[in-house]
Amino acid sequence: MDIRAAEISAILKDQIKNFGQEAEVSEVGQVLSVGDGIARVYGLDNVQAGEMVEFPGGIRGMALNLEADNVGVVIFGSDRDIKEGDTVKRTGAIVDVPVGPELLGRVVDALGNPIDGKGPINAKQRARVDVKAPGIIPRKSVHEPMSTGLKAIDALIPVGRGQRELVIGDRQTGKTAIILDTILNQKAIHDNGPEGDKLYCVYVAIGQKRSTVAQFVKVLEERGALQYSIIVAATASDPAPMQYLAPFAGCAMGEYFRDNGKHALIGYDDLSKQAVAYRQMSLLLRRPPGREAYPGDVFYLHSRLLERAAKLSDERGAGSLTALPVIETQGNDVSAFIPTNVISITDGQIFLETDLFYQGIRPAVNVGLSVSRVGSSAQIKAMKQVAGSIKGELAQYREMAAFAQFGSDLDAATQRLLNRGARLTELLKQPQFSPLKTEEQVAVIFAGVNGYLDKLPVSDVGKFEHGLLSYLRSEGKAVLDTIRTEKAISDDTKAKLKGAIDSFAKSFA
């Protein structure tokens, strides 16, 4: 048998030539124990707080507790396939998500993975979920209105671009409906408004039923509002770490628009469930519990999230991120731990009441307890002119109505006040999915505060409003256009508006 050494060495050299020389070095650790979505890992000595780690099978986790002899890792996914002794790898990256316009119209989970079955998202940029909020110098005071399309809010509790306005109330009082209507109200601007006025919307669903989220997405899709919205969903069946992370992920997506000179709105629905998820994680990580068993830094959890909503200065592109966090109360108790925390962080609250809801006053806004700490600087001049008196009149009405229950012989002035108040309360009612443009709201409230409703039966106020709007949209279009462009009611506009309402009132009678 003839062995040719030269030929064998040539073959070996040829084989070795294509052999990859780079060896991947990664720091690894071992799972000591796992359960309830928490893994204790030995090793990983140089891991950073908040760093992503990888378990076998591609499951991700985040290092939260860095202790002397082990690392506490929360698992983003099911811990069923992770067992003691498994190898855990560092990724070297702090938790980040895809951001950018490519996400518009999509439904994603807390890590930015699509869950709507519409294929992958080819985002060109990624951003860390937990970044520092802008400081004092890069900010500017809130001065542009963020129109919700709801009369009760835009007239009495105005929200500005860059503000944080809390929506608080018991379950089933219409909290989500306010956010939904606000998102739907942006459609008109997106269809034919200038780019600088467009408001991109992010909706974060935390711990909700999947059917509820699906319904929300369906409404947006049917009404053409999904194209400018991003939905981040961490539903009730998702692990607690995902529910904790979802608001931060949504915020990072909203910040992309804020930092690029655009305007965005983010609704967190709701932060009570995020606090519960964070409490669960903290207790399992054996962090010491505080009031109501929440960890000591639950205030910081919400403050660092909500401080990221801001109106940036002109040097920074004048973008904004407006936040509408939702908090669910138990039995109208606003003095519980989480509600008081979030009330103190935000720039005002819209307080919804079960009693008002069942009386048919919807949106069920308690005007007395609701405030906006930005106030009239977030309104156009026309709205300030008409809505200035309505808040005072309603406050007097509520006070008088309480006394009027006891006495029957009321003087004429009190009677007039009660009549006007009842009609204004009726005027502020609004069905769902029917947001109004600002100039239409101005016209309707103008009719209310100038006594056009005083002679009508309360039951006809809604009909009068509906008819007046139809009339103005067809016959009085010029007046509405003037209010929209001038953003104020001059004496000339006032006379024209009065004339239009007078001519409609004659035909209505």
From Swiss-Prot:
Keyword Transport assigned: yes
Entry membrane topology: Peripheral membrane protein
Main location: membrane
Entry binding sites for ATP: 169-176
Any single Pfam family the record assigns to this protein: ATP-synt_ab_C
Family named by the database record: Belongs to the ATPase alpha/beta chains family.
PANTHER family according to UniProt: ATP SYNTHASE SUBUNIT ALPHA, MITOCHONDRIAL (PTHR48082:SF2)
The protein's name: ATP synthase subunit alpha
Top-level taxonomy: Bacteria, Pseudomonadati, Pseudomonadota, Alphaproteobacteria, Hyphomicrobiales
